[in-house]
C-alpha cells in the first residue's frame, strides 16, 4: 500500500457564508413548518403530545412510524404451529 501525505482541507470565508445562509434557510423552513402544524392541530392532538401518559405517547409514536403491535397468545399453536405431538 502506498503512503501519502494527508490531504489539506482549507475552510474559506465563502464556504462559511454559504453554510450560514443554508442553515438560516433550513431554520426558517423548520419554523414555518412548526407554525403550520401548530395551527393545524387545534383538535387537541398537540396537547396529547405533551401529556405525561406513557400509553398515549407510545401510541403516537407507533402511529407515526406505522407500527401496529400484534398481541401475543401463549398457546402451543402460536409457538410451534400445527405440529402433532
Swiss-Prot record:
One of its GO biological process terms is: cell division
Question: Which residues does UniProt call coiled coil?
Answer: 7-38
Q: Which InterPro entries match?
A: APC_suCDC26
What are the annotated GO cellular component locations?
A: anaphase-promoting complex
The domain of life for this entry's organism is Eukaryota
Q: How does it assemble?
A: V-shaped homodimer. Interacts with CDC16. The mammalian APC/C is composed at least of 14 distinct subunits ANAPC1, ANAPC2, CDC27/APC3, ANAPC4, ANAPC5, CDC16/APC6, ANAPC7, CDC23/APC8, ANAPC10, ANAPC11, CDC26/APC12, ANAPC13, ANAPC15 and ANAPC16 that assemble into a complex of at least 19 chains with a combined molecular mass of around 1.2 MDa; APC/C interacts with FZR1 and FBXO5.
Record-given protein name:
Anaphase-promoting complex subunit CDC26
The encoding gene: Cdc26
